[in-house]
Amino acid sequence: MHPDSSRKLALKAVVNQTFCQVCGQESHGAHFGAITCRACAAFFRRVAAGANFEVKCKDGRGRCKILTNGRSCCKKCRLKKCKDIGMDIQNFQFNRDSFATSTKVAPSLSTFLGRPEFLLSCSPGTSASTSQNKFIDLSPFIKNCKQVLMDDRKIPLAPGKTRLQKLSSSLDFEISANNKKKKTDLRKVSTLGFSEAIQIFENELLMTSKWLAHFEEFHDLGNDFKFKFLECTWNIWNRLERVARTAALLRDQKISNGKGNEIILARNCVIDLRTVKFEVEWFTNYSLSEISYFIEGVGDWSMNKPLQAIIDFNPTEIELNFMLAQISLTCASKQMDSQYQETIDNLQKLIADDLHSYYIKEMRLPVYSSRIQKMMKVNNMVLRVMWERKEKLSIARMFNIFNPNFSHPELVKDVF
């Protein structure tokens, strides 16, 4: 008789057996060629096919008793009994999943192409092109800024004013219904392209330089320090100045939720985000929709985060200039060499003394900690937006999304 046939007959003879042939407990059915309980079936499935440990007999004689409670059994003797009653590893079944599985993870399309998912739909005619990068010469702007910073004349000649008052004289945030001329001077920008961006860039550099020139102690420092300071701080200075100027406009329009549609870009420029047209061909090979995540005012709205806080605070011009000085000195202390740290600390102490004098003598406010707290809240929000922006720019550089070639790249490291 065929061995398989005899095995089937033997199994059929005991199929009605109600007890496990290994341990004597109540059986669960036929498992691997014998009638066993679930515990013995699981034991055989786990151990018989090759355990990761050496199975040894407990007493060393190979005659251990298989207890009916299924516990504390000798594994070697239990396995031997399983095999003696006809349990066979050939009855093991593998790969019974309804779908095929693989240990190898299939590469995603973004991994295969080497581009992030938000750029996968880009057209080969534009996004994959290798057009020559646009060269942008910043030398004229730098020359003008150096002339302002290195001018031997002290600006302004006002010995009776404090440092913060001198700084305030270089800025004017009065945008109100009573000053219709200033409101009409605001030029609405309908298109943001290369020429508009360069004009705004030049305006922001010169504004920061002229403001710093009103800081007498800063004016007396070395030229290398002054230009390095401008290089580190002009962007964060203009971010806060832009937020403050926008808040003044929104406050005048009685928009208190910080979600106005108009955002002031520079001293006399304003943009309506509902209608403005962005031209990005001069700094990228991708379309605007493909890289909107990286463009402020399109897919990146983080610049609006500090608006409500500064609208609620409503700082005076002296307080605003202190905020501008404090945030600039904070950024400079983190980016400039340690040899300049003492100089920066001294400048911070000078403006702090002026602010204290302003609160005590002019505002008659002996306890002003709450206003300091509100100022620091706005500055910290602007700094946080700046750090988040830097993270996005690092991703953009990794994938070569922005491709303009600047003559002085260190000056625009926080922009492109």
Curated annotation (Swiss-Prot):
Where does it reside?
Answer: Nucleus
Annotated GO MF terms: DNA-binding transcription factor activity; sequence-specific DNA binding; zinc ion binding
* Residue ranges for the DNA-binding region feature of this UniProt entry: 17-94
Q: Which Gene3D superfamilies match?
A: Erythroid Transcription Factor GATA-1, subunit A (3.30.50.10), Retinoid X Receptor (1.10.565.10)
Looking at the record, the residues that make up the NR LBD domain are 162-415
Question: Which Pfam families is this protein grouped with?
Answer: Hormone_recep, zf-C4
What is a single cellular component term in the Gene Ontology annotation?
A: nucleus
Zn finger (NR C4-type) location: 20-40, 57-82
Which InterPro entries does the record cross-reference, listed alphabetically?
C.elegans_Orphan_NR, NHR-like_dom_sf, Nucl_hrmn_rcpt_lig-bd, Znf_hrmn_rcpt, Znf_NHR/GATA
Provide the primary localization.
nucleus
Among SUPFAM superfamilies, the record links this protein to: Glucocorticoid receptor-like (DNA-binding domain) (SSF57716), Nuclear receptor ligand-binding domain (SSF48508)
Keyword list, A-Z: DNA-binding, Metal-binding, Nucleus, Receptor, Transcription, Transcription regulation, Zinc, Zinc-finger
Task: Tell whether DNA-binding is among the UniProt keywords.
Answer: yes
**What is the role of the protein in this entry?**
Orphan nuclear receptor.
What family is it from?
Belongs to the nuclear hormone receptor family.
This one is known as: Nuclear hormone receptor family member nhr-59
